[in-house]
Regions:
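An N-terminal, well-structured beta->alpha segment
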Residues: 2-104, 199-232, 240
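Ferredoxin-reductase
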Residues: 2-13, 76-164
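Flexible hinge/switch segments at interdomain interfaces of large molecular machines
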Residues: 34-44, 189-193, 259-266, 512-513
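Metallocofactor- and cofactor-centric catalytic cores in central/energy metabolism, strongly enriched
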Residues: 58-62, 122, 505-507
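Catalytic-core signal marking the mid-to-C-terminal active-site face
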Residues: 429-547
Length: 547
């Protein structure tokens, strides 16, 4: 992994995206459905692309929106459709395009009051609250966001009535219908003008912000945070939660400083990520240099990505806490401080999350539910309360309300951030200090994720790796105990491989949203062992994708 000379430094002018050119390309570019890279493709979190590459243009948005209307009709989903969008430059035009199709199809659309930017968790929360107690007329939702991806990116997610990311069978249906519409030059897409859509009887306004903020007391112990007057800092990274944080501070009377309230779709205020891209990733020490530099001003600080479904935790004692480490801390704390959760509520993790989570679950006597990458695999369990917590290595998590009922079934960056404040106030230690106590008791993991460029063809080869392609019986000096191509929790394909020994493991898989592949590795022995794990994994992956 080659680190850019710009990494961790303020974004220079030459890296800033030309917003007028980008938006012009959104409207003028016409994708060719015969070219695979220009088709609609739902990854682990929706369809993403860039107008410059003909992978996220108005045609894509029109086609996906019509496909969703047809899916709703086929499934008998006829309640309101909650719509949110983030602060990326392409999100507002895409939201306008989507509304023109949704209104033409007679869908009751719930737009944010005052055209407020809306975080992903606020949409999931709204769907769940609306559908509670209903068996018909169910709501669903759309979020226009490419998450933490660079400023030139656009994205489109669909959340069905369970409030979580759409399952694979849903996205495949929508994807196929959208590509059919693209191939037919949008014949079959219903559309009215934006002015007509805004005035339509089916277009409504919804107060996402205050509904979400007022309900937080039912998932986080706000009294505990306020009672010790913690000094809290938050950097929304120019994202959709910019005004949510000030509302939270005011509503709950918290000593919370929003260190950056700027919204700028070039994201010029960011420090550059590892590869020379501007990427609003709250789990990256390169992208988070701004808040890390302020760590000593606060008892605990946090950040979220543009749609606020990911979190980053910064402490004065440890700086930026690695996502896996904070997941383990959160699980250990929550299951011992939520007495009204079901006694059989399980711990949800993905195959690339830390083995420390397994050890924490064992210590607190909770069942582990291990699934492929993708938060959609946690949605049903969070919905029915059989999962107390679901978390991903990429810093996405959600958990139940204090009474054990569902809060959100999509990733929520705000509640893990506020949980860091809750645990600091109640335990008198920040999350980094709590983590060190965990590792003293259970062992310290050394982990790394290596990202490398890969073409779509190479990603396809990697995704088809099978256990019989691993002929070695040893990995980094230890006997191989297990080779997985399917997750043990739900027996779903992981889209790659996970190879495990007594004190280490690696997993290799292609990214579902970017042209990269990822190797995850972890050792409970030390850095040298970790390095050996990565080297041997790299040999296997390079051999697979060079075929």
């Amino acid at each position: 992994m080659t680190i850019s000379p710009f990494a961790g430094k303020p974004a220079p002018a030459q890296l800033l995206v030309d917003i007028p050119r980008l938006v012009t390309a959104y409207y003028t570019g016409q994708p060719d459905a015969a070219i695979s890279t220009q088709r609609v493709a739902f990854g682990t979190s929706g369809h993403r692309g860039s107008s410059f590459e003909l992978s996220f243009n108005e045609w894509h948005v029109l086609a996906i929106s019509q496909a969703i209307c047809l899916y709703r009709e086929a499934q008998g989903i006829n309640g309101p459709l909650f719509v949110g969008l983030d602060t990326h430059a392409l999100s507002t035009p895409a939201g306008a395009s989507a509304l023109e199709v949704l209104a033409a199809n007679g869908v009751h659309v719930m737009l944010a009051e005052g055209d407020e930017y809306t975080p992903t968790p606020a949409i999931s929360h709204a769907i769940i609250c609306y559908n509670r107690g209903r068996t018909s007329g169910l709501a669903d939702g759309i979020v226009i966001t490419p998450s933490h991806n660079p400023p030139q990116s656009g994205g489109y997610k669909y959340n069905p009535p369970n409030g979580g990311p759409a399952d694979t069978h849903v996205t495949k249906w929508i994807e196929a219908k959208a590509n059919e519409l693209l191939a037919n030059k949008l014949a079959g897409v219903k559309r009215i003008t934006h002015a007509q859509a805004l005035k339509a009887d089916t277009t409504h306004r919804h107060d996402y912000l205050n509904s979400y903020v007022a309900d937080l007391v039912n998932v986080i112990d706000m009294d505990a945070i306020r009672s010790v007057d913690l000094r809290l800092g938050v950097d929304p990274l120019g994202g959709a939660g910019v005004r949510y944080w000030s509302a939270i501070a005011e509503h709950y009377r918290l000593n919370l400083d929003v260190v950056n309230t700027e919204v700028d779709s070039t994201f010029r205020f960011m420090s550059v990520d590892w590869d020379g891209q501007i990427r609003m990733d709250p789990s990256s020490s390169y992208a988070m240099q701004g808040l890390i530099g302020l760590k000593d001003r606060f008892d605990v600080a946090f950040a979220c990505d543009p749609d606020h479904d990911r979190h980053g935790i910064v402490t004065p004692s440890g700086g930026l806490l690695a996502p896996n480490n904070y997941l383990a801390v959160s699980i250990d704390y929550l299951f011992q401080n939520r007495p009204d959760w079901r006694a059989d509520a399980a711990v949800g993790k993905t195959v690339v999350s830390s083995g420390l989570i397994d050890r924490v679950a064992g210590r607190i006597g909770r069942r582990l539910y291990e699934v492929p990458v993708g938060f959609k695999w946690f949605a049903d369990g969070l919905f029915d309360g059989s999962l107390g917590f679901g978390g991903e290595e990429s810093a996405g998590a959600s958990f139940l309300r204090k009474d054990g009922s569902v809060w959100s079934t999509d990733k929520d960056g705000l509640i893990p951030a506020l949980l860091a404040a809750e645990m600091t106030s109640r335990k008198g230690q920040d999350p980094s200090q709590i983590y060190r106590g965990l590792t003293d008791a259970l062992g310290e993991p050394f982990a790394i994720r290596v990202d490398a460029k890969a073409t779509p063809a190479q990603k396809a080869l990697l995704g088809k790796l099978s256990p019989d392609q691993v002929t070695s019986t040893e990995l980094a000096g230890e006997s191989i105990q297990q080779i997985l191509s399917h997750a043990p929790g739900n027996n779903q394909a992981i889209g790659g491989l996970k190879v495990m020994t007594e004190n280490g493991w690696f997993a290799a898989r292609p990214s579902g949203t970017e042209d990269i592949y990822k190797i995850y590795a972890e050792s409970f022995i030390g850095e040298d062992h970790l390095k050996q794990l990565v080297e041997e994994a790299q040999v296997l992956v390079d051999g697979a994708i060079s075929q």
